Structures are given as structure tokens and as C-alpha cells.
Amino acid sequence: MRKKLVAGNWKMHGSLQQNAALLELIKAGVSSLPCEVAVCPPYPYLGQVQSILSGSALAWGAQSVSEHQSGAFTGEVAASMLLEFGCRYVLVGHSERRALYGETDTVVSAKFEAVQRAGLVPVLCVGETLAERESGMTSVVVARQLSAVLGRVGVAAMASAVVAYEPVWAIGTGVTASPAQAQEVHAAIRAKVAELDLGVANGLRILYGGSVKPQNAMELFGQDDIDGGLIGGAALVADDFLAICRAAN
């Protein structure tokens, strides 16, 4: 039985005051929930998050990472640095990183490897644009993104990783993939991994990300191959985020 995971991606939002209030509400609300819950704040707030959440049921992580371990890479953050702030998870390959900052499949797979090398859990984000979906390329695009990582690190590495399917056309748009649409892609991701190792595939948690709200979370999370959610905007509102977490149970 795969344990559900709900992870909040704060993106470039927050302040010390806002974060403290949000975290205290979430911390109080998830203490009795059987699913795993995590938050991914901007880098500068990791120390604050660690201070507030240490000893709680909540995990935390980062939104990106450098593929390098150290060196003259101005503005970059190494996975080993994230480990020192108590991070458990690191997002790699989020669609905004791919689209806005030119992260290729090669770069994403290198980041995935760097995260695992540091002892952290990568959350590999995959997904198609609207144009790719409308041209029937969803399965091809997602398979390519997944294969780039599998080709670099091997299928065994997926036993200590998470995958998040995020249809780009549904992120921040208010448009959500239907439960059936999401399930179809999640099942295809699991089948792709199963071609290499059935046991790893059966244990792999695959999250859905793309305009998840309290109103649609339960139906999405009720699908056979959807193991939780990667939550954007709703993760910034305690009541909404907690409602989504409850829907995962």
C-alpha cells in the first residue's frame, strides 16, 4: 500500500510573518492525518521552516537544486546544503524550471542524481503542454522525460524517488485534468517503470499537480494510480491545503 503524499509548492511566495502563521496552522491540522505532508518554500525561508517544523509530522523540501556539488556557480544551491536545513524532498524538472530557465531533460536527470547522491528524495516533475496534448503527444513527451532519468540513474533509483505528473496546461490556470485523464497518464508512467522493474513500479508514488482544489481533490486522489498531489496556489491557504490533505485519506 503506497502512503499518500501531499506536497505544497510555495513557488516565489511568502514572508517571514506569513510563513509563520501558515506553518502553525498546517502543523496543527495535519498532526492526526495518516498521509505524509510536505512544504517546499523558497530557499531563504528553509531555516525558518526547519525551526518551526522540527519535531512535527510535517516534512519540507526545496523547489530546485544545482546539479553540481560545489564550485563557482553563482546563485546556485547544492543538495548537500539543503540537507543541512533538514530537507527531505527536492523538486526537479518542474515545468516552470523547464520553460522559464531552459532546463533540459539532461539537466533534470543530472539534478535528480545529485539529489539522491546527497541522501534526499527527488520529486521528478513530468508533463505536457497544451499544444502537445492537442497533438496527441502526451504519452511520448512524458515517456521521454521519464526515460532521460531512467537512462542516467537506472530503475532501482526510482525506489527512493517520487514522480509528479503536472500537465502544464493545468498549472495555475484553474483548468484541471479530469480524474480519468490524470489516471490514464499516471497508469502509463507506472507501466513505463514496470517494464524495467514491477516491484519498483508498484511502490512508486506518483503525484498529480495542476489546479488541485478542495473541491476536486477527493475524486483525483481516489484514482488507482494517483498517490497524492503537488499543490501550488492552494498550498498558500491553510484551510484549502488542509482540506486537500484530508481528501488524501
From Swiss-Prot:
Pfam families for this protein: TIM (PF00121)
Cellular compartments annotated: Cytoplasm
Positions with a binding annotation for substrate: 9-11, 172, 211, 232-233
Taxonomic superkingdom: Bacteria
Single GO cellular component term: cytosol
Active site: 94 (electrophile), 166 (proton acceptor)
Known EC number: 5.3.1.1
GO MF term list: triose-phosphate isomerase activity
GO BP term, pick one: glycolytic process
Catalytic activity: D-glyceraldehyde 3-phosphate = dihydroxyacetone phosphate
Stretch forming the signal peptide: none
Keywords: Cytoplasm, Gluconeogenesis, Glycolysis, Isomerase
Main location: cytoplasm
Protein purpose: Involved in the gluconeogenesis. Catalyzes stereospecifically the conversion of dihydroxyacetone phosphate (DHAP) to D-glyceraldehyde-3-phosphate (G3P).
Protein family (similarity comment): Belongs to the triosephosphate isomerase family.
Name listed for the protein in its UniProt record: Triosephosphate isomerase
